C-alpha cells in the first residue's frame, strides 16, 4: 500500500441513499486499516448530516452510484458531492457494486472481531445501506491499489448518533475548531486562532488525526471521559511520569499506524514482466514497515518501565494489555530471526535505502547477497567519482547529495565556479547559491545502483513473505498498539503538555453529569487567552429551572466571544481535557448548534436573512433536549419588527424544550421574555461611558443593559448634526417611557412566579451537590426562611 505520508485524512468514502432519504456511508482509512459504517436519516434537504460526516472524515475519494439510472429522490448525495466537494475525486460505480449481501459477507470475513462480538446479525437490517457502501468501497480499493484485503485484519465499527456529540459543519466553522473563521474570509494565516492548532503539539501523525477527530466528534460516555481525566490528574501530579512518557513516546516511529497497512493488505501476484519501478517501490515500503515495526517493538520495554507504577485505570490498562502482552515479544522474536538487529529506521534517503537493502540477515538468500555487493560496489564507485572530480577540477566543496527521484547528483557552490563548468558536467541547474549537475559517468552508475537496490528490495520481499504471513496472524495486537500510541500521544503531548505551559490553576478538571446544571465559574476563551494575557473571565450557570440566557450588550462588548467560549469549554470537557475555568460542571451535550455571523451566501444564492433562516430551521428540526444552542443576533438582517417577531418566536420554541440556549441580542424587547417566562435569565456586558465614549469592561452582569442609547452615542461621535441627534433623543425618550411603563406592569404580574422558580433552581443545585446531609438540611432551612420573609 502506498502511504500518503501526511496529516490529511487518508479516507475513502462510499455513499448511497434510498427513497426514504436514508443515507449509508462506509469510510475506509487506508493508513490504519479501519472501516467505519454509518447509516442515518437526512432531516434536511441540505444534507447537513452527510456534510458533517464528510467534514469529519475528509475523504480523498468519494464513491457514489450513477445518477442516470437512479430514481427520483435517490441522487441527492451524488449531487451534493458535485456541488460541495468538487476538489475531491469522485468515482462513479455501477449500482450492482453496492450490494448489501456481499457487503455483509465481506465484513464477516475481513473483520478482526468475530461476527457475534461485532453484532453483525443485529446491525444487518439497520445498516444495510452502509454494508452496500462498504462492498463498493472495498471493491474499489482492491482494484485501484492492486491489493487484497487479508481476512480478519480490519477494525470495523458501526457508528450510531448515540456514540459521540454531533457538531454540524457550520458550527465547526463558527467555533473555529479546525481552521480560524477569518482565514477563509480574509486570507490571513493566523492558524493559532483555532482550537486544533492550539492543541496540535502531538508528535505522531496518528495522534494529530485522533485529536482532530475528537474535536469534531467529542465523547458522550461519562465513564470514558473520566478515565481520560483520571489519567490527566496523574500526569499533572506526577512530573516523573509525565516527562518519562513524553520521552519514551519519541522513541516510537511517527508513522506507527502506517505499519498496519502492509499487513492488512496483500499485494496481488504479478508476473516477472510486470515487475518494475512501481513494484520496487511497494517492496521498499513493505521493508520499511517491518523496520518501523521492529523499532516500535524495541521501545515497548522502555514504555513498560515508565508505566509500571502508574495508578490510573487508563495507564494501568495500557501496561497490562500492551506492555505485558506476550504476543509482542513473539512478533519481535520472529522479526529477529530474519531481520538484522543493527537495522534502524532512518529518514535520510540514502541511509534509509541502505538500511532497507541490508535489512535481511546475511546468508539467507544468495541472489540477495550478490545484489548487495553490486549495490555496495556502485555506491563506492559513485563516491570515488566525486573525489576524482574534486581533485581534477579543483572543486573542494563539491558535495554528493541523494534523493529518491534522481539518485545521486553533484552540488557545487556558485562562488567556486569561475566561468563555465567543464563539459563533463551535464544537466546543469542553478539552485539558490549552488549549482546542481550530473555527468554521464554518474548517470550510468546511478542506473546500476538503482537497479541493484531494486533487486535487493524484491529479493528481500520474497524472503519476507513467510514473516509477513506470521505477523498477519497477530494483526489485532498491532491494531491495539497503534491505537494506544495515538491515544497516549494525544493525552500526553497535547492535553498534558498544553496545560503544563499555562500558569498554575488556570485549567481545572471538569465534572460531567447526565442531568445536572451547566456551570462554569470564571471561564475563559481557550484560544483568545493564549493570545491576550489580560483576558477577562466570565461565568455561566444554566439548569432545568433556567435553560435560556439572553445576553445583551453593544457591538464589541464581548457577546460573540462569550458564546464561543461556552461551546469550546464544553467541547474540551467532553474530549477528556481540563478546561480554562476555576470550576466547571457540564451536563453532557449530544449536539451543539450555532447561529453566528452575518454574510450573504453567494454560492447558494442566499441573502444574509435567508442564510439565518436556513440555519435556524436546521436547528429547529434537529434540536434535542440535551443540545446546547448559541444564537448571535438572530433577526437583525431584516426589518426590526419582523426580526423581533422571529427572534421572540424562536426563543419561545426553544424554551419549550429542555435544551440549554444562550441568545445574544441587541433587541431590548427580548429582555421582556424574563418577565413572562421564569426559566429565562437576562445578562448584559457592562460598559462604562466616559466623555460620550464607550469603555468596554467585558464583564458579564445580571439584569438588562444599562447603557442609555449607545447607538446615539456612536452616531454623535461619528459626526451627525446636533439637531438630528437632539431630535432622535426626544423621540427615543417618548418610546422608552412608554415601553418602561408596560414592562413594569408585566414585571409586577410575574413577580411571584419568578420567586417560585428561584426556589426551584436552588433545590436543583442542592440535588446535585456533594454536601453532607447536615449541610443540605441547613441550606433548606435557610431557603425556607428567605422565601417566607420575601428575601428571595
From Swiss-Prot:
Keywords assigned by UniProt?
ATP-binding, DNA-binding, Meiosis, Nucleotide-binding, Nucleus
An example of a GO molecular function for this protein is: ATP binding
List where the protein spans the membrane: none
Q: Where does ATP bind?
A: 553-560
SUPFAM superfamilies attached here?
DNA repair protein MutS, domain III, P-loop containing nucleoside triphosphate hydrolases
Q: Which domain of life is it from?
A: Eukaryota
Q: Where in the cell is it found?
A: Nucleus
Q: Which InterPro entries match?
A: DNA_mismatch_repair_Msh2, DNA_mismatch_repair_MutS_C, DNA_mismatch_repair_MutS_clamp, DNA_mismatch_repair_MutS_core, DNA_mismatch_repair_MutS_sf, MutS, MutS_con_dom_sf, P-loop_NTPase
The biological processes this protein is annotated with in GO are:
homologous chromosome pairing at meiosis; homologous chromosome segregation; meiotic mismatch repair involved in reciprocal meiotic recombination
Query: What is the annotated tissue distribution of the protein whose record heads this document?
Result: Specifically expressed in flowers.
Write out the GO cellular component annotations: condensed nuclear chromosome; germ cell nucleus; plasmodesma
Q: What this chain does, per the record?
A: Involved in meiotic recombination in association with MSH5. Required for reciprocal recombination and proper segregation of homologous chromosomes at meiosis. Promotes homologous recombination through facilitating chiasma formation during prophase I. Involved in the control of class I crossovers formation.
Tell me what this protein is called.
DNA mismatch repair protein MSH4
Organism encoding this protein: Arabidopsis thaliana
> According to the entry, what is the taxonomic lineage of the organism?
Eukaryota, Viridiplantae, Streptophyta, Embryophyta, Tracheophyta
Amino acid at each position: 500500500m502506498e502511504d500518503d505520508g501526511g496529516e490529511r485524512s487518508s479516507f475513502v468514502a462510499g455513499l448511497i441513499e434510498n427513497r426514504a432519504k436514508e443515507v449509508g456511508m462506509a469510510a475506509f482509512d487506508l493508513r490504519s486499516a479501519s472501516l467505519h459504517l454509518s447509516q442515518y436519516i437526512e432531516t434536511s434537504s441540505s444534507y447537513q448530516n452527510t456534510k458533517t460526516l464528510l467534514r469529519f472524515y475528509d475523504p480523498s475519494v468519494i464513491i457514489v452510484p450513477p445518477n442516470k439510472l437512479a430514481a427520483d429522490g435517490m441522487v441527492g448525495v451524488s449531487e451534493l458531492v458535485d456541488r460541495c466537494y468538487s476538489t475531491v475525486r469522485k468515482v462513479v460505480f455501477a449500482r450492482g457494486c453496492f450490494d448489501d449481501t456481499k457487503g455483509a459477507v465481506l465484513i464477516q470475513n475481513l473483520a478482526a472481531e468475530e461476527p457475534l462480538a461485532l453484532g453483525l446479525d443485529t446491525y444487518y437490517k439497520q445498516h444495510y445501506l452502509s454494508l452496500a457502501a462498504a462492498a463498493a468501497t472495498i471493491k474499489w480499493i482492491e482494484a485501484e491499489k492492486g491489493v487484497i484485503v487479508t481476512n480478519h485484519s480490519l477494525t470495523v465499527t458501526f457508528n450510531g448518533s448515540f456514540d459521540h456529540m454531533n457538531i454540524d459543519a457550520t458550527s465547526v466553522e463558527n467555533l473555529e475548531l479546525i481552521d480560524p473563521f477569518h482565514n477563509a474570509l480574509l486570507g490571513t494565516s493566523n492558524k493559532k486562532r483555532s482550537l486544533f492548532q492550539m492543541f496540535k503539539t502531538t508528535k505522531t501523525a496518528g495522534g494529530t488525526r485522533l485529536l482532530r477527530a475528537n474535536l469534531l466528534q467529542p465523547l458522550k460516555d461519562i465513564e470514558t471521559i473520566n478515565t481520560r481525566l483520571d489519567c490527566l490528574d496523574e500526569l499533572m501530579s506526577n512530573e516523573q511520569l509525565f516527562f518519562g512518557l513524553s520521552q519514551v513516546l519519541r522513541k516510537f516511529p511517527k508513522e506507527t499506524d502506517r505499519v498496519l497497512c502492509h499487513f492488512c493488505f496483500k499485494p496481488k501476484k504479478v508476473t516477472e514482466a510486470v515487475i518494475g519501478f512501481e513494484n520496487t517501490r511497494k517492496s521498499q515500503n513493505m521493508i520499511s514497515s517491518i523496520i518501523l515495526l521492529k523499532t516500535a517493538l524495541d521501545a515497548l520495554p522502555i514504555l513498560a518501565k515508565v508505566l509500571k507504577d502508574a495508578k490510573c485505570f487508563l495507564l494501568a490498562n495500557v501496561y497490562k494489555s500492551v506492555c505485558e502482552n506476550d504476543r509482542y515479544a513473539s512478533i519481535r522474536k520472529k522479526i529477529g530471526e530474519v531481520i538484522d538487529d543493527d537495522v534502524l529506521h532512518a529518514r535520510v534517503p540514502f541511509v534509509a535505502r541502505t538500511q532497507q537493502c541490508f535489512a535481511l540477515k546475511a546468508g539467507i538468500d544468495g541472489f540477495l547477497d550478490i545484489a548487495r555487493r553490486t549495490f555496495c560496489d556502485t555506491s563506492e564507485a559513485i563516491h570515488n567519482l566525486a573525489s576524482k572530480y574534486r581533485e581534477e577540477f579543483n572543486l573542494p566543496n563539491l558535495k554528493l547529495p541523494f534523493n529518491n527521484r534522481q539518485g545521486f547528483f553533484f552540488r557545487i557552490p556558485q562562488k567556486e565556479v569561475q566561468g563555465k563548468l567543464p563539459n563533463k558536467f551535464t544537466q546543469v541547474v542553478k539552485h539558490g547559491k549552488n549549482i546542481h549537475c550530473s555527468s554521464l559517468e554518474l548517470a550510468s552508475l546511478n542506473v546500476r545502483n538503482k537497479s541493484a537496490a531494486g533487486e535487493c528490495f524484491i529479493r528481500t520481499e520474497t524472503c519476507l513473505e513467510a514473516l509477513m504471513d506470521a505477523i498477519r496472524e497477530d494483526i489485532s495486537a498491532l491494531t491495539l498498539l497503534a491505537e494506544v500510541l495515538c491515544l497516549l500521544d494525544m493525552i500526553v503531548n497535547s492535553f498534558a503538555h498544553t496545560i503544563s505551559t499555562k500558569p498554575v490553576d488556570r485549567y481545572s478538571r471538569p465534572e460531567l453529569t447526565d442531568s445536572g446544571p451547566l456551570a462554569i465559574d470564571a471561564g475563559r476563551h481557550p484560544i483568545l487567552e493564549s493570545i491576550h494575557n489580560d483576558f477577562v473571565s466570565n461565568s455561566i450557570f444554566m439548569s432545568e429551572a433556567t435553560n435560556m440566557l439572553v445576553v445583551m450588550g453593544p457591538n464589541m462588548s464581548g457577546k460573540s466571544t462569550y458564546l464561543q467560549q461556552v461551546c469550546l469549554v464544553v467541547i474540551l470537557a467532553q474530549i477528556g481535557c481540563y478546561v480554562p475555568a476555576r470550576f466547571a460542571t457540564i451536563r453532557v451535550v449530544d449536539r451543539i448548534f450555532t447561529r453566528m455571523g452575518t454574510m450573504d451566501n453567494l454560492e447558494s444564492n442566499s441573502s444574509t436573512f435567508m442564510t439565518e433562516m436556513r440555519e435556524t430551521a436546521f436547528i429547529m428540526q434537529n434540536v434535542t433536549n440535551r443540545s446546547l444552542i448559541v444564537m448571535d443576533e438572530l433577526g437583525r438582517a431584516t426589518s426590526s419588527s419582523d426580526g423581533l417577531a422571529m427572534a421572540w418566536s424562536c426563543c419561545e420554541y426553544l424554551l419549550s424544550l429542555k435544551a440549554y440556549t444562550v441568545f445574544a441580542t441587541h433587541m431590548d424587547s427580548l429582555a421582556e421574555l424574563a418577565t413572562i417566562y421564569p426559566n429565562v435569565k437576562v445578562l448584559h456586558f457592562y460598559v462604562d461611558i466616559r466623555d460620550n465614549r464607550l469603555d468596554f469592561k467585558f464583564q458579564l452582569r445580571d439584569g438588562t443593559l444599562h447603557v442609555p442609547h449607545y447607538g446615539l452615542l456612536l452616531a454623535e461621535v461619528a459626526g451627525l448634526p446636533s439637531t438630528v441627534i437632539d431630535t432622535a433623543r426626544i423621540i427615543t425618550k417618548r418610546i422608552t417611557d412608554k415601553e418602561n411603563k408596560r414592562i413594569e406592569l408585566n414585571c409586577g404580574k410575574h413577580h411571584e412566579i419568578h420567586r417560585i422558580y428561584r426556589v426551584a433552581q436552588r433545590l436543583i443545585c442542592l440535588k446535585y451537590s456533594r454536601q453532607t446531609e447536615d449541610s443540605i438540611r441547613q441550606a433548606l432551612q435557610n431557603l425556607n426562611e428567605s422565601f417566607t420573609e420575601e428575601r428571595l
